[in-house]
């Protein structure tokens, strides 16, 4: 028996790469988290065209992935084109294309989904509104607690690199640190690469990074710091000596009364380097092993 189905006129969806569809869906999901559901329906065509052009420009510069989301610029551009397609078919009043002779100019305030009428002065600049707290909390990749960001990073890494190891992640971190150095510490994307790897390594090691940082900062707040000759800083202890190599410990048992009670005295000395400590020990104790 031969099956018959009339598909004439139907869209050949098999021509679309499903991975591209998934990438666009991820862009849309992040957009909803960042701006709210269907926020784009209040935008104007010209604004969306600007966004699409920016992503295409990044592709022309061989920058394939968006720094903020980590997703492909092609998927970002496609999502913007989809919005434009929908608005042109369903909300023709959104069509404010600058170079269309049939459309009067509409001035829109950036950062808002509603057009702002011109002031009486005509060309007066409109103030840019500060983002509301509720909106800022929805940002997916740039706000939240350290624990939130660590969870976000590890979730992505688990899906993308499920077989990664701590050693491999540390090796990658070293490479990213070199790239950050090459960029003269001016590239936000390189900073983000280093931070992402640090948080993922901590997650792989089972470290609650938020608690670890809080505990360490409590210690740092109590320390006194001094600048060293190489420009770095080291915390200072014991009346001004800097922490260096672990100290040599001396223990002495001193009698305190005729009954035989003793007082244990522990003394230590710190050294600036391992060679200094070894030299001091040899001078004091000869070849006897500690």
From Swiss-Prot:
This is dATP/dGTP diphosphohydrolase. GO terms for molecular function: hydrolase activity; nucleotide binding; zinc ion binding. The keyword Protein biosynthesis does not apply. Its cofactor is Co(2+). Gene3D superfamilies: MazG-like. Belongs to the Caudovirales dATP/dGTP diphosphohydrolase family. InterPro entries: dATP/dGTP_diPOhydrolase_N, dATP/dGTP_dipphydrolase_MazZ, Znf_C2H2_type. Catalyzes the hydrolysis of dGTP into dGMP, which is needed among other for the first step of biosynthesis of dZTP (2-amino-2'-deoxyadenosine-5'-triphosphate).
């Amino acid at each position: 028996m031969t099956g018959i189905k009339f598909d004439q006129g139907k869209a050949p969806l098999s021509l679309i790469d499903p991975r591209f569809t998934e990438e666009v869906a991820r862009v849309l999901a992040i957009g909803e988290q960042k701006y709210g559901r269907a926020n784009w329906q209040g935008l104007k065509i010209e604004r969306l065209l600007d966004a699409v052009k920016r992503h295409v420009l990044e592709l022309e510069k061989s920058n394939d992935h968006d720094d903020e989301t980590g997703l492909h610029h092609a998927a970002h551009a496609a999502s913007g084109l989809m919005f434009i397609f929908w608005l042109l078919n369903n909300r023709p009043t959104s069509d404010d294309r600058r170079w269309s002779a049939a459309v009067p100019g509409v001035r829109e305030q950036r950062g808002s989904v509603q057009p702002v009428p011109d002031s009486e002065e005509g060309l007066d600049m409109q103030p840019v509104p500060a983002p509301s707290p509720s909106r800022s909390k929805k940002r997916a990749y740039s706000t939240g607690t350290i624990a939130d960001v660590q969870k976000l990073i590890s979730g992505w890494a688990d899906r993308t690199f499920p077989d990664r190891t701590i050693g491999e992640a540390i090796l990658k971190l070293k490479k990213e640190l070199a790239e950050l150095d090459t960029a003269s510490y001016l590239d936000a994307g390189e900073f983000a690469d280093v931070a992402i790897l640090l948080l993922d390594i901590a997650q792989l090691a089972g470290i609650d990074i938020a608690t670890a940082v809080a505990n360490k900062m409590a210690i740092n707040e109590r320390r006194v710091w001094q600048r060293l000759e190489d420009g770095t800083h080291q915390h200072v202890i014991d009346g001004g000596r800097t922490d260096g190599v672990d100290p040599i410990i001396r223990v002495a048992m001193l009698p305190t009364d005729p009954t035989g009670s003793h007082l244990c005295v522990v003394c230590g000395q710190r050294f600036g380097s391992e060679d200094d400590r070894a030299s001091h020990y040899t001078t004091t104790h000869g070849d006897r092993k500690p």
